[in-house]
């Protein structure tokens, strides 16, 4: 039974006895509510993880802990009701992220952004900046978005659909905006795969440098 006491003690009580492999399993499988940069995957400690969870979810530590152990297939009892369909919350790191940093992959950023748009999750500062591309796409590509939606409704995918985005220095950001508008319709996974298919690694790198310079 998890007692409703100090959140730090609750979390540390259960994390401190985990093996390193189990702890890595938490990091890699709990992506619905945790985001760690490449650097943090190898350097984060249990204490740091606990402090971030407590800071970001002060009223939901029991729930977060229960989800962690469900991920690990460990049956535990809790003194709270865990909803069967929890509305995903912003990832720990991304909820407060206000700027792009070099150790964050652009693909991770875009993947989470599309998921947040599809699932109507509140956006952090950096995502709000990126969301301006979606708003711009709604105004600029209304007809094209309608055609893309018709294509998807007919075929169930956008594999052979050519995005109506002219190739210029704004190609990556405009592609993100266009696909973000479609994300609630086609799903964030298909929107993300279309982004990977359509935007080259070089264009992604250029766009990441642009984000880092702001």
From Swiss-Prot:
Alphabetized InterPro entries for the sequence: Orthopox_C1, Poxvirus_Bcl-2-like
Matches recorded under Pfam families: Poxv_Bcl-2-like
Keyword Transmembrane helix included in the entry's annotation: no
Keywords: Early protein
Induction notes from the record: Expressed in the early phase of the viral replicative cycle.
Family to which the UniProt record says this protein belongs: Belongs to the orthopoxvirus OPG034 family.
Name under which the protein is recorded: Protein OPG034
Organism for this UniProt entry: Variola virus (isolate Human/India/Ind3/1967) (VARV)
Gene designation: OPG034
């Amino acid at each position: 039974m998890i007692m409703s006491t100090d959140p730090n003690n609750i979390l540390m009580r259960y994390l401190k006895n985990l093996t390193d492999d189990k702890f890595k399993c938490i990091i890699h499988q709990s992506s619905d509510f945790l985001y760690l940069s490449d650097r943090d995957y190898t350097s984060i400690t249990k204490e740091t993880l606990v402090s971030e969870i407590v800071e970001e979810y002060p009223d939901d530590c029991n729930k977060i802990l229960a989800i962690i152990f469900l991920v690990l297939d460990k049956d535990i009892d809790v003194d709270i009701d865990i909803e069967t369909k929890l509305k995903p919350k912003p990832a720990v790191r991304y909820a407060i992220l206000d700027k792009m940093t070099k150790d964050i992959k652009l693909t991770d950023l875009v993947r989470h952004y599309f998921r947040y748009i599809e699932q109507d999750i509140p956006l952090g500062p950096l995502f709000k900046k990126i969301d301006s591309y979606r708003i711009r796409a709604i105004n600029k590509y209304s007809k094209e978005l309608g055609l893309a939606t018709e294509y998807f409704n007919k075929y169930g995918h956008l594999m052979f659909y050519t995005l109506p985005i002219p190739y210029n220095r704004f190609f990556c950001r405009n592609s993100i905006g266009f696909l973000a508008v479609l994300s609630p319709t086609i799903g964030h996974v298909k929107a993300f795969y279309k982004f990977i298919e359509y935007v080259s690694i070089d264009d992604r790198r250029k766009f990441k440098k642009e984000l880092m310079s702001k």
